[in-house]
């Protein structure tokens, strides 16, 4: 795979995976390189992107309803599912408090963005916080973390199918059951995901989501199951595929290291991500492929990530990673190359089931 600036120096032939070195730059160095205005949300701009997405979604519904043609529906499904995903990314900014400096506004727009696409805003926001605090940590990361070679060999067939073959539909299951080998639900305040002080936030999002399910049920009662399928269920599935595809590719790549124990640090984990180019939809889904800078500084609004990325590249040098491959090729390569990591070692890499574990 061609990378923008580096191959991650994957030690294919080394006898140890211990990593006791320090990075040649600090979090402070990276922050100093980024223009101060990149950290400042612009409420007008943030609201523009939210209402832009809502407007496009509304127009797509109007056109689909007017034409009511099976020739158009496949186009509608793809476009509307993509816009559901774009709306999710707006709520993602709200969850990071990078939409605005007003928490009430972030929570309001977050719920307006996430509830219609059946995402519990606060429940997801909190678990996503756990992911960002532990990115690249095999033991503590929340999503898309690797299994070890021994875990892979002992994994039941049904779990292998879910993890390696139908993972692009995994998100709804994750909301109910959390990631493999972890317990908890995004809907229940008693889940280990949440602190007692977060109870009412979680309940609020859950109640609103139940209300959305009730609304869908009422509309289905009025207009029938075919209405639900044509106008909501299929776009929702497209959205789920987008969400799982993008988040999987953020952190699943043979050249990206994973850490255990004391060799893991926040910054090492944050830069163990990769930027990817999603072509025509790159800006439609709000530059979410610009992921390295986002993981380092969560409070940068999505519309400032490209500028921030260009600022940190010279500081990071060979530690900055960007794939120039087409997305379909990156997905294929990750699927056939990233099955498990070695059972031991403080710095390890994915390997394929068809190859010996990388040292």
UniProtKB/Swiss-Prot annotation:
Catalyzed reactions: a 1-[(9Z,12Z)-octadecdienoyl]-2-acyl-glycerolipid + 2 reduced [2Fe-2S]-[ferredoxin] + O2 + 2 H(+) = a 1-[(9Z,12Z,15Z)-octadectrienoyl]-2-acyl-glycerolipid + 2 oxidized [2Fe-2S]-[ferredoxin] + 2 H2O; a 1-[(6Z,9Z,12Z)-octadectrienoyl]-2-acyl-glycerolipid + 2 reduced [2Fe-2S]-[ferredoxin] + O2 + 2 H(+) = a 1-[(6Z,9Z,12Z,15Z)-octadectetraenoyl]-2-acyl-glycerolipid + 2 oxidized [2Fe-2S]-[ferredoxin] + 2 H2O
Pathway assigned in UniProt: Lipid metabolism; polyunsaturated fatty acid biosynthesis
Region (Disordered) location: 1-20
Span of the signal peptide: none
Transmembrane portions of the chain: 47-67, 70-90, 207-227, 228-248
Record GO terms (molecular function): oxidoreductase activity
Skewed-composition ranges (Polar residues): 1-15
Major localization listed first in the record, in broad terms: membrane
Cofactor dependency: Fe(2+)
Tree of life domain: Bacteria
Enzymatic class: oxidoreductase
Its EC number(s): 1.14.19.36
Motif Histidine box-1, residue numbers: 92-96
A GO cellular component entry from the record: membrane
Induction context: Constitutively expressed at low temperature.
Membrane topology: Multi-pass membrane protein
Sequence motif Histidine box-2, location on chain: 128-132
Gene Ontology terms: biological process: unsaturated fatty acid biosynthetic process
Short sequence motif Histidine box-3: positions: 294-298
Keywords carried by this UniProt record: Fatty acid biosynthesis, Fatty acid metabolism, Iron, Lipid biosynthesis, Lipid metabolism, Membrane, Oxidoreductase, Transmembrane, Transmembrane helix
Family, similarity comment: Belongs to the fatty acid desaturase type 2 family.
Biological function: Desaturase involved in fatty acid biosynthesis. Introduces a double bond at carbon 15 of linoleoyl and gamma-linolenoyl groups attached to the sn-1 position of the glycerol moiety of membrane glycerolipids.
This protein's domain notes: The histidine box domains are involved in binding the catalytic metal ions.
Designated name of the protein: sn-1 acyl-lipid omega-3 desaturase (ferredoxin)
The encoding gene: desB
